[in-house]
Amino acid sequence: MAEQKAKVVHGPGPRGMGGPRPKVENPGKLLKRIMAEVFQHYLPHCILVLICIVVSALANVQASLFLQTLIDDYIIPMTQQQDPSFAPLAGALVRVGCIYVVGILAAWLNARIMVNVTQGTLRNLRTQLFTHMESLPISYFDTHPHGDIMSVYTNDVDTLRQMLSQSIPQLVSSAITIVSVFASMCMLSWQLTIVTMLMVALMLFCSKKITQQSGKYFIAQQRDLGKVNGYIEEMMEGQKVVKVFTHEQKALEGFRELNDKLKDSAKQANSFANIMMPVNAQLGNISYAICALVGAAMAVTGMGGVTLGTVMAFLSLNKSFNMPISQVSMQANSIIMALAGAERIFKMMDEPSETDEGYVTLINAKYDKDDNLVEANERTGIWAWKHPHHDGTTTYHKLEGDITFTDVDFGYVPGKTVLHDINLYGRPGQKIAFVGSTGAGKTTITNLINRFYDIQDGKIRYDGINIHKIRKADLRRSLGIVLQDTHLFTGTVMENIRYGRLEATDEECIAAARLANADGFIKRLPDGYNTMLTNDGANLSQGQRQLLAIARAAVADPPVLILDEATSSIDTRTEALVQRGMDGLMYGRTSFVIAHRLSTVRNADCIVVLEQGRIIERGSHDELIAKKGKYYQLYTGNLAEN
C-alpha cells in the first residue's frame, strides 16, 4: 500500500548470548488451557488412556516383583534337588509371560488412542486458528509478518503434537511407575530404597540444572524458526524484485544472519538436552552398582531378611525407577518447547476479532403492489438497506451508492494522523478519481469506505446511513473492489471469477469476463475457463491477472466500485481493452478510481487531488488543468514522462 501505515512488527526475538532469554509466561495456565482443549472433546479417551497406562505400569512392576518369587521359591530350591522338576518353573514363567502380554497390550492400546486424541486435538486447534484468523482485522495482517503467522500453523502446532502424543503420556506413565516402584522397593528393603533415593536426588539436581539452561534456548529456537520462515516466505514472494535489482547476495546475507541465530539457539538447546540422557544413564548405572554391592552384602550377612531373590527383584525395580526419572527430565524440554509454541498459538487466538456494531443489513428487495419496497427471498436485482429502529419499526431504503465523507480524520497509529479533514461525496453513478503523489492518502480513503480501518473523527455515510451502523459483511458485499495487488486463488479461471459471487452461474461469469475484455485471452488458454491456476496465477501475465480481478469484481454486480491502481501495471494495449470494459462496468455505478496514469481518469465526474493526507484541489479535468495547480503539474509531468 502506498500510504503510510503502521510499521510491520516482527515479534521480539532472542538477544545475544549474554543477554536475557525469553521466557514462557504462565506455563501452568498454558498447560491447563491445552488440556482443557483435549478434555473438551476427548475426556472418555483420556480416561481409557490413563487406565491403560496404569495397567502397563503395574504389569512391569509385578513382573519385577515376580523375580523374587522365581528365584527364592523355584530356582534356588531346584538347585538343591537331585532330580528337580521343571513343571512348576514352567508354570511360573507362563504366568509372568501373561503379565508381560497384558502390559504390552495396554501399551499398544494407549498408543493407538493417543494418536487419535492428538491428531483430533490438533485438527480442532488448526480449525479454531483459521476460523479466528478469518475474523481478525486487516490491521493484524498489515502489522505481522505472514511467515510468522504460517509458523504458528506449522512449527508451533507440531510441537504440541509431540507433547500430546509423547511427552504428557510419558510423564503420566513415569509418575505412576515411580509411585508403584517406590512402594514396591520400600516393601522389599527400606535400606536399599534409601540408597536409591540418594542417587535419585543427585539425578534430579543435575536434570534441573540442565533443563533450566536448555529451556531458555528451546524457546529462543522456536522464535528464531518463526523469523526464518517469515524471511523465506518474503523472499519467495519478492523473488522477481530480488533478481531485477540483483540483490541475491544481499538476500543471502540476510538469510544467513537469521539462520545463524537459529543455529546458535538450536545448538545451545540441543547441546544441553543431549547430555541429559547420558548423565542420567551413568548416574543410574552407579545407583545400580551401589545397590548391587550393598544388597549382596546384606544377603550374605542376612541383614534385614534380604535374600538373593530380594536383591535381584530390587535391582530390576532400581532400573525401572531410574528410567522414568530420566524420561521425565528429557520430556521436560519437549514440554517447554511445546509451551513456547502454545504461547504463540494462543496469543494469535486471543487477538481481538474485528468488531462489528452494525445492525443495518443488505437484502434482496422488490416492490409490492403499492410500490413499496419489501424484502424478497430470491435474487431480484434490487438491493435495499434493512434498517431496524429503536421503536421496533423497520424501514427499507433502496441501495443507491451515495457515499459522503464529512470532516474525516484518520491515522493508522495513535497520534499520527494521515488524513486530515476529508470532505467529499460520490453521488450515485458518479466517477470519483483520486490522484496525488505516493503516500498522499489515496488508498487509505478506499480502506475507510470498506471499513478495513475505522476513522478517528468525522462521519462516512452510505445512502445517508452512517457506515458504522451497517454490518461490515453487508457493507463489503455492496462494494466491488479491484485491489492494487491482484491475488488469484488455486483453482480454475472460472472459480476465480466466481469468487466475486459464489452463487454466480457459468454464464454470468463468462458475461463478466467479456465485460472486462478477459474472454479473449481466457479462450486461448489450454483449457479455457477450466484452466487451473496455481501459485497466485504465476502462469498468467500481470495484465491477464488484472483482467481476471476486474472480471471477479464485475460478476458481483456491485453498486459501488473501488478500483485501486487497477490499470497501473497493464501495458498500453491491454489498458485500452480494460478501459472500455471498465467504462461499461462503471456506468450507473458510483466509482472511486485511483490510477498513476492520469489519462485514465480524464472523464471522471470529479477529480480529487490529495497531498500529505489533505484535499488540496477538486474539480473536473478541464477545471483543474485551467487552475494550473498540483493536478496540472502531475498531468503534464505524466504526459512528458510517457
Report the location of each language-model feature:
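Transmembrane helices of ABC transporter permease
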Residues: 41, 45-58, 99, 166-220, ...
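An intracellular "coupling" helix at the cytosolic face of ABC transporter transmembrane type-1 domains
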Residues: 40-43, 138-139, 155-164, 168, ...
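Short intracellular "coupling" helices and adjacent cytoplasmic loop segments at the cytosolic face
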Residues: 13-22, 119, 127-151, 155-157, ...
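Helix-loop-helix
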Residues: 77, 184-198, 268, 272-343, ...
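Hydrophobic alpha-helical transmembrane segments of ABC transporter permease domains
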Residues: 32, 51, 106, 110, ...
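Juxtamembrane helix-loop junctions of ABC transporter transmembrane domains
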Residues: 20-28, 52, 59-75, 99-146, ...
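ABC-type nucleotide-binding domain
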Residues: 82, 365-642
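Membrane-integrated ABC transporters
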Residues: 1-60, 75-96, 110-114, 118, ...
